[in-house]
Amino acid sequence: MRFRPATLLASLLFAAAAGPTLAQTSVPSASSATSTRLDPTARAAIVAQLATELRSRYIYPDVGEKGAAAITAAAASGAYDRLTDLPSFARRLTDDLRGVLHDKHLAVFGETNRPAISVASIPGGEAGIVRADRLAGGIAYLEIAGFSNPWSFKPALDRAMAGLKGSRAVILDMRGNHGGDPASVSYLVSHFVPAGKRIEINRIVWRKAGTRDLTRKPFFSERTPVSFAGLPVYVLIGGHTFSGGEELAYDIQTLKLGTLVGETTGGGANPGQSFPIGHGVMAFIPTGRAESPVTGSNWEGRGVQPDIAVPDADALATALRRLGQSPAAATISPVSVFTQRAVPLRGSEAMLRRLLAGRAAPEPDYTLLAADTGEPGRAAFAATHRRLQPLGDPQAIHFRRPDGFGFDEFTLVYPDQTLLVAIELDPSGKFRGLIGPDKVSP
């Protein structure tokens, strides 16, 4: 499950359009659709299917009904008649629905779009971990841009935390964190829970499609190789902290494990999933909500409030002062204790080569697809296949880096160009998603 803001990545959400367990990290840009022209019949069909999906799946049934009614009425009034290109239509549907639902995760976008975020602009740092430094005064500093899937996040975090062992305080920088998998969020929080104590950190409430029935998936603290329980913990937050990044801050605050410093966060707490709605269009629909076991609520629509309110640019300096250190401690003699891996995960290059080798087939080989991705995953895989079909055989394939979303990035070398792609597999080696291909700038 994943949370991400609307300014990020149709490509990732669409690439990783797995089941709801993936849905809390990424939200597509409404403007990331293709330039397909839409006739009145296509527009009517898209609105009708989107309304059906909202009524069946949106986490709050009554609110979903209001959204469905709003776009149905708008279509009947002729409000969409002049929106003949897919990007404009997708943007208008997104805006209309957000005006009713007030949900920053919801978005409509084109399934065969060029990625809303290029591979080259994906945050660096293995599995979302950008930096792990030991600052002056024995202060551990950890910057995390996102929470990737737990099978890539946990080993990377374990290496970072091992290097920070023995610190007297911890600063977690979430100011640029746009979300991720709640299992990975809970694993980070577990480092600050007293050893031997198992507590419920968060839960996700899911709506069963077509009903008003709800299920709850709890996330508990886990044993970690290194513990920082009892140490002063400061979490830096700001307006760009969103979704899973907000969950980390909310968990730390409600469980009284640390202090939040900075500005109020973005306010997105409803995870979801992308669904095909016809004519090359997808909709990301929140099908769940976060629920704190402490408050019974979450941060949706209002954000997480800091304990110490300062401009987010001043948050690190403020935390350092609270710890008795000069703000210069952030730049004087930091010692990096984390080096990202320099080799691809097992199977990622082989899977990429297999996808390229099969690109001429009319349909992708669905036996390669992770089992839990469902129909949205099949649609995403088909779109990936279509994006790869125009490519020739690369002269060479080179591993570039692990990225901040838990994907492995590769360059595809051709005589006249070099392309970037990023691929994600599940723990069993099955395909979960691909971003790109994107041209490498000269």
Model-inferred region functions:
Residues 92-166, 213-214, 284, 298-330, ...:
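C-terminal, low-ordered peptide segments at domain boundaries
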Residues 382-429:
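Surface-exposed, charged secondary-structure patches
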Residues 61-137, 376, 380-398:
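Extended, small/polar residue-biased N-terminal targeting/export presequences
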Residues 50, 97, 142, 172, ...:
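Terminal peptide-recognition signature
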Residues 34-46, 326-357:
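Short, low-complexity N-terminal intrinsically disordered segments enriched in polar/charged residues
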